[in-house]
């Protein structure tokens, strides 16, 4: 049997590194279909830190796409697992027959599914991408994204799968000891990416709570974002006093980020699609409820796991937030499907499906 090849077709360092380390640490030892990778980006020590994997790096999307298409044409038994699919050339190859449906397995990350960009280039490309998506052999995604995808592509097979968020299961009970009182601290957004709509989110928080809460905005990732960070900071200072606004421009190491999250009382995410599951998981683990846009279908996954969900359209106040905290504290976090290590079973099944080992 031909070994499955995994494709990280865009240079998204943080997510690509997370996926590679997860496969190296949790999957490669038990499955030959978890070892071969084609990745856009620089090695930057990844080969050394992931010795169980065979990783081929490419300087750009185009060179990787050409290599994938060549492999697909040379051997029609070769199957590919695409982790987030932001590479236009690969969609066009699937649409034109360069890659066959039986070769194309796609784990939806979020931004690769939704059509939120308004630029002319995107508007021209989205219809072609939609046509190509009808030809995918199988999609893997959150419950909410599967539901969203099925509305337009009901005949494509869908399987539940969660991004392998880096988590320490021993911290699942850490929130139970925390006493929450006094001025609330609200986390706004999961990164410095514009998709977080930081300014609109800050205005929404101010409309709900006024200048009575402390707002923390993590913007250390992606890099080279200084102009936008300053734009957000200035907009925030028009709404909140300086002592109540903390805009973080430096990238935090994982432990420092965890410490930051534990100091919060609420996460506020205004984006109208699924994104930031890693941050949501870490907040929920710490007993911190989240406010979501109703257009973000991840609320379906949360309610399926009996987790409280607040919406941006709700009338929020401190009593409602504290009640959500109490509800979250009563949940056995060791049973949550999208937490580590529970998502591991889904990955083992996904590998078997993509490799053709199970129907």
Swiss-Prot record:
Instruction: List its EC numbers.
Output: 2.4.1.325
Record-level GO cellular component terms: plasma membrane
Which pathway does it operate in?
Bacterial outer membrane biogenesis; enterobacterial common antigen biosynthesis
The membrane topology noted for this protein in its Swiss-Prot or TrEMBL record is: Peripheral membrane protein
User: Is Glycosyltransferase found in the keyword set?
Assistant: yes
Please state where this protein is localized. Cell inner membrane
Q: Name one GO molecular function term.
A: fucosyltransferase activity
Q: Which keywords are on file for this protein?
A: Cell inner membrane, Cell membrane, Glycosyltransferase, Membrane, Transferase
Give the record's GO biological process terms.
enterobacterial common antigen biosynthetic process; fucosylation
Q: Name one Pfam family in it.
A: Glyco_transf_56
Domain of life the protein comes from? Bacteria
Q: Which reactions fall under this protein's catalytic activity?
A: beta-D-ManNAcA-(1->4)-alpha-D-GlcNAc-di-trans,octa-cis-undecaprenyl diphosphate + dTDP-4-acetamido-4,6-dideoxy-alpha-D-galactose = alpha-D-FucNAc4-(1->4)-beta-D-ManNAcA-(1->4)-D-GlcNAc-undecaprenyl diphosphate + dTDP + H(+)
What InterPro entries does UniProt report for this protein, alphabetically?
Answer: WecF (IPR009993)
Query: What function is annotated for this protein?
Result: Catalyzes the synthesis of Und-PP-GlcNAc-ManNAcA-Fuc4NAc (Lipid III), the third lipid-linked intermediate involved in ECA synthesis.
By sequence similarity, the record places it as follows: Belongs to the glycosyltransferase 56 family.
The protein in question is named TDP-N-acetylfucosamine:lipid II N-acetylfucosaminyltransferase
* Protein species of origin: Escherichia coli O157:H7 (strain EC4115 / EHEC)
The lineage is: Bacteria, Pseudomonadati, Pseudomonadota, Gammaproteobacteria, Enterobacterales
